[in-house]
Amino acid sequence: MKKRILAAVLAAVMVFSLAGCAGNKNESKDSKKESGKKTEIQVFIAASLNTVMTELAKEYQKDHPDVKITYNADSSGTLLTQIEEGYECDLFFSAAQKQMDQLEEDGLVVDGTRKNVVNNQVIVVTRKDSKTKVKGLETLKDAKSIALAGGSVPVGKYTRAALISIGKLKKVEDPATITTEEVSKALGGVEISEQDNVSKVLSAVVEGSCEVGTTYYSDTYGYEKDLDILEKVSYDLTGDVIYPIAEVKNDEADKAQKAAAEDFLKFVTSDQSKKVFDSYYFDTNVK
């Protein structure tokens, strides 16, 4: 039996008040129907999608009040591991192709449902009025402290790839394998605080516990008064930052649940949703 994601266990899980809390998996489908409960879908999203997906869920549920959307938001690597370990999931929205590729290799993606949705951009940020000497990636060594996601986190991998591109790190087959300690050494021993996901990187900079950090452009939405963007890192250095979405095979889902997951995926990839993504600083011009 697949494990359920409970808000009390995973702090990153977002359950909308209009959707209620995740129920006990031991509850039978018949009892759910009898009690009038909504059709629930489990949607695993990269942490950087938290804000925009909150907006999209609210929009979707205006026309689909019978569907309950439960989000689990974390780094794409963590979400992949959870799915592989048996956590119940209907849709996976990753911040990188690597994790989705692995899920397909595992045979856990529903054939024909994978779609590229948005592109993002890695940026170097600092808190307003920090008076940092850092101007961008080239001068990261001048920082007093850096918030950096681990290599298994997409933004951490993209940052490492960019540092390789500008000659700050040695070229390796997979940038994700470069440790935080190796990055620190390459940057002259600068203090680096490794973070589990991009949201924690952002928080570390906004709260002032780290002088600078690398995050996504979309993460600055709502923080314009708190942050200064020191550099928008060129795609030539990182490659495209594509976010794919797909249905995940869920043997315990009934027909209504599978239909709801399919319909929500269509909504997320619709022209209506593109306008919302654009407003949250994502690039929807992807193939």
Tell where the protein language model's regions lie, with residue ranges.
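Central helical "cap/lid" subdomain
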Residues: 107, 111-115
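Exported/periplasmic ABC-transporter solute-binding proteins
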Residues: 22-58, 62, 77, 97, ...
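Ligand-binding clamshell of periplasmic/extracellular solute-binding protein-like
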Residues: 71-81, 88-104
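Short, high-confidence coil segments that cap the C-terminus of an alpha-helix
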Residues: 66, 88-89, 210
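A generic structural motif
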Residues: 64-70
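C-terminal motif of bacterial Sec signal peptides marking the signal peptidase cleavage site
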Residues: 17-20
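Positively charged n-region of N-terminal signal peptides that target proteins for export
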Residues: 1-12
